[in-house]
Amino acid sequence: MAHVTPPIMLPRLISGLSEIAANHDALICDVWGVVHDGARHHPAAAEALYRFKEKHGPVVLLTNAPRVPAEVQIQCTSYGLPPDCYDAIVSSGGAARDDLAIRARDKTLLLHYIGPDRDLPMIAGLDIRRAPIEEAKVALAIGLRDDMTETPDMYAVELKAMRARGITMVCANPDLVVHRGERLLYCAGSLAKAYEALGGEVVYYGKPHRPIYDSALAAAALAAKAANKQSPKRPLAVGDGLLTDIKGANGAGLEALFIADGVHGEETQPYTGEHMESLFLRFGAKASAVTRALKW
């Protein structure tokens, strides 16, 4: 009997979230590139979050921002995103802080900090002292110190010195790059990959790693309980990063909606199901539906 190859199921191209929302009872939504661009929020995305929350279930913002959720909320609000269009925020920065709190529980943690001073509140209140590489027990990578002008290769000497001492890097943002307005900037994930290439040990917090999805689903369940609804059984993950948002959703067993005009915008043309499927195969990530931008 001849072997018959099953047909490839192409992703569904949709014009808005309303076309598939009824199939889901919770939304796990990326932030940067989906609901804001690092400068201002996307009103159509905010409306989509409102509508889903009103009609179908809780909305949890899941971000690889290297900040605690309260700081992420302040930032999102400053960009114009209404805080009542979502139920909770789960951040990689919050998860990384929890790790450092455990490491600093018994004695002062000597930490080599890689990131801008504006993100230092992430470790405020912990028994941590910033230290040079020769004294540090662990390194925290939040991002480049000046992501507007620097690139990861400028950190080669620093990373080699860390590797020589066998320092573990805690990466609070696994994203490689991100859009800020029209610019593409490097994130802490790029530093982490460079450190791994040297043989260094990296502990990642955030997407695509499973624990952050467990935290997001737990937050969705709490929000549902507070609204006297059943715990979500059919959550949908939304994001524009194939290696983080979509691959992470796949690993967590969640259906995914890919936002095509985000970080991969230049790679998503022509905008056809066949091209999207080839893009998914190239990145090893799969979304069941695709839309250009998040809207209802």
Write out the residue ranges for each language-model feature:
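Asp-based, Mg2+/Mn2+-dependent phosphohydrolase catalytic module
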Residues: 2-31, 36-57, 62-65, 70-90, ...
